């Protein structure tokens, strides 16, 4: 797991330090959340109305695969935690929705991301947000302290997803909600992709099947589990082919249509 974690950390540190060049060293791996012209995973995720008052640079540095703040009706006064908060977009959107009596935490392991997130918070003038350094497998918050957990294309990056989901369950209050966007695969990936760190950092190699996701959430204690497909990816896209270079053309065609983004919802029992 340490090798995966360090590989992911390096890729996203590079992405935020070289904004506009892509997290994998080429254009298209990580682009803004408004236009889908450049990137098959991160493009066209947010409505412009949601982003009013936020710095355009913040929007351009969102590296997710969905809009988890659209998943859940956040209530005034609630406490939200974003696992793998990156440059802070979903944290700041959540903070606006829960109002001054609520709070939004962002957790990230990458110093470069945290620095940018804190600067974005300063520019936005939002006071009810806090960014924490740490790992999503070891959440530095008390048990039963969070109303809603969100995450945006991050859980697939972990080498120990069981631990992530158990930690999420631990920090949620009874009846707390789990609402994330993540990459899901319809069929298992070939082992040669699973061993490719570039494909891990690109949100491909660590993706779970729907059955795996449901099983791990259930074993962690969650109930009312649902997965909703929101986007299907074209593996012929040049941005994805660079991470799938170990596959033959025949294998690409065989796996076509098997990689999707999903909204994943679950709840902690009362």
UniProtKB/Swiss-Prot annotation:
UniProt entry tagged with the keyword Methyltransferase: yes
Q: What class of enzyme is it?
A: transferase
Keyword Translocase among UniProt keywords: no
Give the consequence of mutating residue 203 to S: Lack of activity
The source's domain of life comes to Bacteria
Pfam families on file: Methyltransf_31 (PF13847)
One Gene Ontology MF term: arsenite methyltransferase activity
Q: What is its EC number?
A: 2.1.1.137
> Catalyses which reaction?
arsenic triglutathione + [thioredoxin]-dithiol + S-adenosyl-L-methionine + 2 H2O = methylarsonous acid + [thioredoxin]-disulfide + 3 glutathione + S-adenosyl-L-homocysteine + H(+); arsenic triglutathione + 2 [thioredoxin]-dithiol + 2 S-adenosyl-L-methionine + H2O = dimethylarsinous acid + 2 [thioredoxin]-disulfide + 3 glutathione + 2 S-adenosyl-L-homocysteine + 2 H(+); arsenic triglutathione + 3 [thioredoxin]-dithiol + 3 S-adenosyl-L-methionine = trimethylarsine + 3 [thioredoxin]-disulfide + 3 glutathione + 3 S-adenosyl-L-homocysteine + 3 H(+)
For biological process, the GO terms are: methylation; response to arsenic-containing substance
Keywords from UniProt, A to Z, are: Arsenical resistance, Methyltransferase, S-adenosyl-L-methionine, Transferase
List the residue ranges forming a coiled coil, or say none. Answer: none
Question: Outcome of altering residue 65 to S?
Answer: Cannot methylate arsenite, but can still methylate monomethylarsenic
SUPFAM superfamilies registered for this protein in UniProt = S-adenosyl-L-methionine-dependent methyltransferases
Family of this protein: Belongs to the methyltransferase superfamily. Arsenite methyltransferase family.
Function per UniProt: Catalyzes the transfer of a methyl group from AdoMet to arsenite, producing methylated arsenicals. Involved in the conversion of As(III) to monomethylarsenic and the conversion of monomethylarsenic to dimethylarsenic. Reduces the arsenic toxicity in the cell and may contribute to the global arsenic cycling.
Family annotation (NCBIfam families):
PRK11873.1 (NF008823)
The protein in question is named: Arsenite methyltransferase
Species of provenance? Clostridium sp
Q: What gene, per UniProt, encodes this protein?
A: arsM
């Amino acid at each position: 797991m340490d090798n995966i974690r360090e590989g992911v950390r390096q890729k996203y540190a590079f992405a935020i330090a070289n904004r506009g060049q892509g997290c994998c060293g080429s254009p298209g791996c990580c682009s803004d959340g408004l236009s889908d012209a450049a990137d098959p995973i991160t493009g066209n995720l947010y409505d412009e109305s949601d982003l009013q008052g936020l710095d355009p640079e913040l929007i351009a540095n969102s590296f997710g695969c969905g809009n988890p703040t659209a998943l859940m009706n956040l209530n005034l006064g609630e406490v939200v935690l974003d696992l793998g908060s990156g440059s802070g977009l979903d944290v700041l959107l959540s903070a606006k929705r829960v109002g001054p009596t609520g709070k939004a935490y962002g957790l990230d392991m990458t110093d470069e991301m945290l620095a940018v997130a804190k600067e974005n918070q300063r520019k936005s003038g939002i006071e009810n947000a806090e960014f924490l350094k740490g790992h999503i497998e070891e959440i530095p918050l008390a048990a039963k302290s969070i109303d809603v957990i969100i995450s945006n294309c991050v859980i697939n990056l972990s080498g120990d997803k069981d631990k992530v989901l158990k930690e999420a369950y631990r920090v949620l209050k009874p009846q707390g909600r789990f609402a994330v966007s993540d990459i899901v695969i319809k069929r298992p990936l070939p082992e040669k992709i699973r061993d490719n760190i570039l494909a891990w950092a690109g949100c491909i190699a660590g993706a779970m099947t729907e059955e795996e996701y449901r099983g791990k959430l259930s074993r962690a204690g969650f109930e009312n589990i649902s997965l909703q497909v929101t986007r299907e990816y074209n593996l012929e896209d040049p941005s994805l082919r660079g991470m799938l270079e170990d596959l033959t053309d025949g294998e690409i065609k065989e796996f076509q249509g098997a990689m999707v983004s999903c909204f994943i919802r679950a709840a902690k029992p009362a």
